[in-house]
């Protein structure tokens, strides 16, 4: 009996960790809501025409400043107060495949699609979370689907934000500014994007733990019963020894 209680168990460890989280199900739902909210902030800032669209990256040299957004790229000369913005519909095929033009075109194709997919997955996670309460008979199916969609949203959004970092080199090469240009990541986009991705990851981890506990509930009950049985046996033994000593 004593040997059984000392055996390490993952489900027991997970259950002990979750004892320190107040209302883990409600807590995880709040995290999902915050992740979705920051994603909406990111989308709204990207769709704002005047900012073209939430700067993700700024490449700058002595003569030119290039702002890179999710849906567009803007060029501005140092001595100019206006900037020229390039969007997908302004793609010029006569450029001969220059690195700058090619990377700009690829950027404008990849990022709107990725962002749309992330929004779809995150919205599905919200819907599936609601369905868990409306149709609890299928809670296992809802939980697995919600875990999958939130994890996919986290990974895709992290991929999208990482591409913004990597694109600094391609834009510098395309502008023939290697070694002379400086690249800075947009603070607002970084905050919205990385916080949203991080919260989706946190929700997925908490949700995975809850699903693991639910799936191994019977095993957890057996371990708990075993532990209490061991404690009860010890108490009875101490009580018996006490009365024996008292009789003497």
UniProtKB/Swiss-Prot annotation:
It comes from the Eukaryota. The keyword tRNA processing does not apply. It is found in: Membrane. One of its GO terms (biological process) is plasma membrane fusion involved in cytogamy. GO terms for cellular component: endoplasmic reticulum; mating projection tip; mating projection tip membrane. Keywords: Membrane, Transmembrane, Transmembrane helix. Induction: Expressed during meiosis and in response to nitrogen deprivation. The keyword DNA-binding does not apply. The chain crosses the membrane at residues 26-46, 110-130, 144-164, 186-206. It is a multi-pass membrane protein. Belongs to the SUR7 family. This is Delayed minus-nitrogen induction protein 2. The lineage of its organism: Eukaryota, Fungi, Dikarya, Ascomycota, Taphrinomycotina. The gene is dni2.
């Amino acid at each position: 009996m004593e040997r059984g209680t000392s055996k390490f168990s993952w489900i027991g460890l997970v259950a002990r960790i979750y004892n320190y989280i107040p209302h883990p199900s409600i807590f995880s739902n709040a995290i999902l809501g915050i992740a979705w909210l920051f994603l909406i902030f990111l989308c709204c800032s990207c769709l704002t025409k005047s900012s073209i669209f939430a700067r993700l990256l700024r490449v700058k040299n002595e003569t030119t400043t290039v702002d890179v957004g999710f849906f567009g790229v803007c060029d501005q000369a140092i001595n100019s107060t206006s900037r020229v913005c390039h969007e997908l519909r302004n793609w010029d095929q006569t450029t001969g495949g220059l690195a700058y033009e090619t990377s700009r075109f690829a950027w404008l194709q990849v990022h709107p699609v990725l962002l749309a997919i992330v929004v779809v997955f995150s919205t599905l996670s919200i819907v599936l979370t609601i369905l868990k309460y409306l149709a609890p008979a299928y809670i296992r199916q809802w939980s697995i689907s919600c875990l999958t969609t939130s994890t996919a949203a986290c990974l895709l959004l992290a991929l999208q934000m990482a591409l913004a970092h990597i694109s600094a080199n391609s834009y510098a090469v395309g502008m023939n500014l290697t070694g002379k240009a400086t690249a800075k990541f947009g603070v607002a986009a970084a905050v919205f994007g990385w916080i949203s991705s991080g919260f989706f990851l946190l929700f997925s981890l908490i949700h995975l733990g809850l699903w693991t506990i639910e799936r191994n509930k019977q095993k957890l009950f057996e371990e708990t019963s075993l532990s209490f049985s061991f404690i009860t046996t010890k108490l009875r033994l101490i009580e018996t020894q006490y009365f024996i000593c008292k009789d003497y």
